[in-house]
Regions:
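Conserved phosphate-binding elements of NTP-dependent enzyme cores
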Residues: 1-957
């Protein structure tokens, strides 16, 4: 078998006909500047060809149902195993998808509950069991030997016969005795007179009359057991699956049934579909398995959960007129020992239940609604003919937890079934860490262990892998569409680990996204585990720790775009350190090109510490942030400085910034913004901010027609310039003629795309150059219009750097000013007409940053960035920091969610959340300068930042 995956002549995107040997069954990192061609090699070449070969091996019939694969531009790839790509995208937008379903743990839980779950009656709390004759015999033998008892069968009234006729038929069948309240009665005596018939008929109606089949004493001998078994089987036959034993002298009754019933309720046999909220069998009928319904929104009724009922927590009970509801509730609260001075968030489930749904003695008056929140809204609904009542109802209506299933998404019958005393809804509310501990302590019988052994091992291994990839704070009922890209990718990674595939090529796109330095070590361990079972693991990555841990590094570069696409260095980093300790500059033995990666790893290049930190005196404060796992914290966000929010995965960074801080400021600036997460107050110098922008890594446009030059508004100026040329004016061409998105000047054959698609039935669609315009996108008469010898196609083919130089020479300052920010953020290598769909996540975010840099906003703006270093090399990060400084110099404010320690060390103010993830997080560990953070030594960020700060300070010295 080949020891290497050999790639020869790769020319995808900007790759320059490269050759590379990738060792198999090793852990390989592909790195390089943003836009250098890493993803082109990993995903567009290796993965695309691996997938294509697999699909090509299937029959033509099967292929027509699969997405057709393009063959990448490469001469050949030898030794390529089947490829699996795990990307950093949020994989599911489905509102039904949860962490449990996407990791398949929920499927195993459903099977576990269906196989070994025990059903308990909601009336008595006793276990519901289907009894056989052997179970009845075993129950009888539990009593002391010699104890007298009778075997009985229930009697039912019959519509088609009188009591007398019923007795006569049974006597003809050879039955002769009855049991009435423990006394034996002969059937012929029961019908000998009108009075006796009336008496026993009444007893039958009241369920006190039974058919007596045998009188016995507890006897464990063979004959005793045999006789008892016969009697029990007869009783079960006569009683239609029911049988009773009455023990003397107490006359106690024990009831047995072959049917699955108890307390007069017939229960459903547990099946795996009963526990599925995606199946009509198991889904709650009211919310149809979503867990939410349109109703009265708790967040709108109680916007400030830190207030008590006495202090006015219930918003709709404020005011002179409606305040009577609050007073009446307070008056009745003492009957139930309700704590009226306790903050709402501290109330128990039972206390909240009383406040929302009422209870005994809570009614206004007999037969009226209860004095509670539900009662208040019911009263409003009764008076809907009044306009003010309809307005009030509309004000508090929104998505709320389904009152029937309480958010469990399942029908009540599913929650009667328990394993280890817990329902399936209880388990999915636990964090992965707590659930793993619960399963480790779970005790099952020997018989149950045999049934559930495989299921339990699958559940435990998947929980273990979720812990290993740093997701121990997630709960299984967390919606997949609420996860970050990094969390989604690590869930996919843990699922891949759980599937135990061997001999495959795993290609991962920056798995360290969203991971704190503390969690990176565990991720490295997981990647090595994947390698050790016999897989080749290729990771596109910029994280220094992951690079140092790799068996092999491939550095693509040396720069980005058309200046990249070459293999700058390929080899083992550990050998490099040994052989290069004396070298001043890192160059490849294979190539004379400079490797920025190696220079950073060897300390030749670095991101410097700022000489001083910006001082601040204005701030915006979030008070009492309590959404998700936040513990009611107060956080100051300084203005006109560079603030970084950091903390381990799941500590509450996104909740604080994305769910509370950003929407709260939006709400302050514009009342129509979406509702922020739960907090008490937004205070501080709010007038100092006039606008807020949240910059994420989502694509600037999914269409192949979208491009960066349109996004930064430079194309408008270019089209105007072309329309001003003498030939264009002579032919009455307006600026729209120079757009490939509008009719007029574009080539109508390809609609301005430059290529036409030819559909092939079982093969990949072919994209061929348009024969009419030869890929130039415009009509010939439009291409004849030139500015200083360049037509519109020539201009779109220029890189940003070339265009700036060209337009600057001819004094076109407006266009240059629009394009300059793209150069400032390190995107000088991209073509003006390059499709946005070809840009990486990091490039997309920098195009947005360039747009803001080019806007010259007069109003002070707060910019919020969510992990801007994603997809960025060390070299790119230093450019990004320059762009950040440019924003700050214009009087704007900057808040960045970030784990990258090079960014953290350059911040003016650090907000560190933690100390752990999930329930153990959500607290403010530290707020201050990086120096003060390291000095305080609190939390994981301080621990990992300290060596970096010391290293830089020694280098400064």
């Amino acid at each position: 078998m080949n020891q290497y995956i050999e790639v020869k002549g790769a020319r995808v995107n900007n790759l320059k006909n490269i050759e590379v040997k990738i060792p198999r069954n090793q852990f390989i990192v592909i790195t390089g500047l943003s836009g250098s061609g890493k993803s082109s090699l990993a995903f567009d070449t290796l993965y695309a060809e691996g997938q294509r070969r697999y699909v090509e091996s299937l029959s033509a019939y099967a292929r027509q149902f699969l997405g057709r694969m393009n063959k990448p531009e490469v001469d050949y790839i030898k030794g390529l195993p089947p490829a699996i790509a795990i990307e950093q995208k949020v994989t599911s937008r489905n509102p039904r998808s949860t962490v449990g379903t996407s990791t398949e743990i929920y499927e195993y839980l459903r099977l576990l509950f269906a196989r070994i779950g025990r059903t308990y009656s909601p009336v008595s709390g006793k276990e519901v069991r289907r009894c056989s004759a052997d179970d009845v015999v075993a129950a009888a033998l539990q009593h002391n030997p010699g104890t007298r008892f009778t075997v009985l069968a229930p009697l039912k009234e019959r519509d088609d016969r009188t009591f007398q006729q019923q007795m006569e038929v049974m006597m003809q069948q050879g039955l002769s005795r009855l049991d009435c309240d423990g006394e034996m009665v002969r059937m012929d005596e029961a019908i000998e007179s009108e009075a006796s018939m009336l008496r026993y008929e009444t007893a039958l109606r009241e369920g006190r009359l039974f058919l007596l089949l045998d009188r016995l004493a507890v006897d464990a001998s063979k004959d005793g057991v045999s006789r008892l078994t016969d009697s029990v089987e007869t009783a079960l036959f006569e009683g239609d699956g029911e049988c009773l034993l009455r023990f003397y002298p107490e006359k106690n009754l024990e009831h047995f049934s072959t049917r699955f019933e108890a307390d007069g309720i017939t229960f459903e046999d547990p099946s795996d579909n009963l526990f599925s909220f995606n199946s009509p069998v198991g889904a709650c009928p009211r919310c149809e398995g979503f867990g939410k319904v349109m109703g009265i929104d708790e967040h709108l009724v109680i916007p400030n959960r830190s207030l008590s009922v006495f202090d006015g927590a219930v918003m709709c009970w404020r005011g002179e007129k409606l305040g009577i509801w609050r007073e009446e509730f307070l008056r009745r609260a003492q009957l139930h020992n309700f704590p009226i001075f306790e903050p709402y968030f501290n109330l128990t489930e039972a206390q909240r239940d009383l406040l929302w749904h009422g209870g005994e003695g809570m009614a206004w008056e007999e037969g009226d609604v209860d004095v509670c929140i539900d009662g208040f809204f019911k009263a409003l609904e009764m008076g809907q003919y009044k306009i003010q009542n309809r307005v009030m109802l509309a004000r508090y209506r929104g998505k709320t937890t389904c009152p029937d299933c309480r958010g469990s998404r399942l029908r009540p019958e599913a929650l009667y079934v328990k394993v280890g005393g817990k329902t399936i809804a209880d388990l999915v509310k636990m964090s992965v860490k707590d659930l793993a501990a619960w399963f480790a302590a779970l005790e099952v019988t020997e018989h149950e262990a045999q049934i559930a052994q495989r299921l339990l091992s699958e559940i435990n291994s998947r929980l273990h892998f979720l812990e290993e990839v740093g997701l121990n704070y997630l709960t299984l009922d967390r919606l997949s569409n609420s996860l970050s890209g990094g969390e989604s990718q690590r869930i996919n990674l843990s699922t891949s680990l759980g599937s135990s595939l061997v001999g495959s090529l795993y290609i991962l796109d920056e798995p360290s996204i969203g991971l704190h330095s503390r969690d990176t070590d565990r991720l490295i361990h997981v990647l090595k585990e994947l390698r050790d079972v016999g897989n080749t693991v290729v990771v596109v990555e910029h994280d220094e720790d992951i690079m140092r841990a790799a068996d092999h590094i491939i550095d693509i570069g040396p720069e980005a775009g058309r200046h990249g696409g070459q293999v700058v260095w390929s080899g083992d980093y550990r050998h490099l350190v040994e052989s290069r300790t004396d070298n001043k500059k890192a160059t490849s033995s294979e190539s004379p090109l400079t490797s920025h990666t190696l220079n950073y790893l060897l300390g030749r290049e670095r991101i410097e510490l700022p000489t001083s930190r910006r001082k601040w005196n204005r701030k915006i404060t979030i008070k009492g942030a309590r959404e998700n796992n936040l513990k009611g914290i107060d956080v100051d966000f300084p203005l006109n400085v560079f603030t970084v929010v950091t903390g381990v995965s799941g500590s509450g960074k996104s909740t604080l910034v994305r769910n509370i801080f950003y929407p709260a400021i939006q709400r302050h600036l514009d009342e129509t913004a979406e509702r922020p997460g739960e907090f008490v107050a937004l205070e501080g110098d709010l007038d100092a901010i006039r606008a807020v922008d949240f910059v994420d890594q989502n694509p600037i446009g999914r269409s192949s027609r979208s491009n960066p030059v349109t996004y930064v508004k430079a194309y408008d100026e270019i089209r105007k310039l072309m329309a001003e040329q003498p030939l264009a004016q002579q032919m009455e061409m307006k600026p729209a003629f120079f757009s490939f998105n509008a009719d007029g000047g574009r080539c109508e054959e390809c609609k301005g795309a430059g290529t036409v698609k030819v559909e092939m039935q079982f093969m990949a669609d072919l994209e061929l150059e348009c024969e009419t315009c030869h890929g130039h996108r415009f009509k010939n008469e439009v291409l004849e219009v030139k500015f200083e010898g360049k037509n519109i196609y020539d201009i779109l083919e220029m890189t940003v750097n070339q265009a700036i130089e060209f337009f600057d020479n001819y004094g076109k300052k407006k266009i240059v000013n629009r394009l300059r920010p793209l150069q400032d953020v390190g995107l000088g290598y991209i073509k003006l007409g390059q499709s946005s769909s070809t840009l990486s996540g990091g490039e997309n975010q920098r195009v947005k940053l360039a747009y803001y840099l080019g806007q010259e906003r007069a109003v002070p703006t707060l910019f919020i960035f969510d992990e801007p270093t994603t997809g960025l090399h060390f070299h790119d990060i230093s450019r990004l920091l320059h762009a950040f400084n440019a924003l700050l110099e214009r009087g704007h404010s900057l808040v960045v969610i970030e784990h990258n320690l090079d960014v953290v060390k350059t911040a003016d103010h650090v907000i560190d959340l933690g100390p752990e993830g999930g329930a153990a997080g959500g607290e403010l560990v530290f707020a201050g300068t990086p120096e003060a953070l390291v000095e305080a030594g609190k939390g994981y960020t301080a621990h990992y930042l300290a060596p970096l700060m010391n290293q830089n300070s020694t280098q400064h010295d």
